[in-house]
Amino acid sequence: MGEVNRAKSIVFLFLPVMLLLSIPAFSQQGNAIERGLQAGTGAGVEQVLTQSTDFAGEWVVRNWQNRLERSAGPSLGDYLGMPLNAAGRMRAETFDAGEWSVRDLQCRPHPVPYQWRAQGAMRIVKEVDPVSRELVAYHTQYVRSLDRAIYMDGRPHPPDYAPHTWEGFSTAHFEGNDLVITTTHLKESYIRRNGPTMSDQVKVTEWLTRHGDYLTIVTYIDDPVYLEEPFIQSVTYQREAHTELEYFPCTIVNENISDKIPHFLPGKNPWLKEFSEQEGVPYEATRGGAETMYPEYRAKMKGMKVAPLKPTPSAF
């Protein structure tokens, strides 16, 4: 009994000490949260704030800003408002729409950032660490695109010589309630369906902002090879809880039997002036360039020569 009494005495002796040691830990956390709230900076409550905007779920695209991209598509030779440099313009002018029928390209997924403007629904899924319960990554999934991981755990981007893919390598962080995504290591691919292209040196920054059931994505394409200035676009999605992504098996078929790769040599594309002649837009303006993005360019267009209008040829 004497040993039992001594053990009880030790427990009662150390219990107040343990309580005293544990109080500062809780009070420090509470004080940090309180200071962050009072300062309005969110310091001390970062984990709470980073989970306050949840992007997970099913979304459907509302192409209010990009109707041109999902209708018949922009015309050949129409680069108005695109900051193409000389190399980017030459690359775009070699485009032949017949390339979409090439077997090697039929099943290629839409690249970042074009996939935001693809038709159909999108799903955003959270990858959560099962032990720490911290957010490891968001995954975006589209009808005809690969699973895109957007890492949230602070991992660095790989070195320049790492493989480039259609979805690239994406990391993200929160700025307030906005999710800011940085993507590198992309393959060269299209940023518009009529020829304008981004190189494999491109860096894409995206801002995701949620307002209730609406999600706005702003993309900032910075390409030192093909663009004079960054190309900025936006698109809106709406949350739709009853939407489900359909199964999309891609089957390669012989759509265009040819022994040539569809393309035009520089200066040999005969369709570049068609848009200008049919729409009454100065041909010089249709060549694009950074200055065509700004409202002031309209005044310059007034002094440009416009070719006589030619009627659009009938398809029947």
Question: What is each PLM-predicted segment?
Answer:
Residues 2-14:
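Bacterial N-terminal signal peptides that target proteins for export
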Residues 12-22:
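Bacterial N-terminal signal peptides
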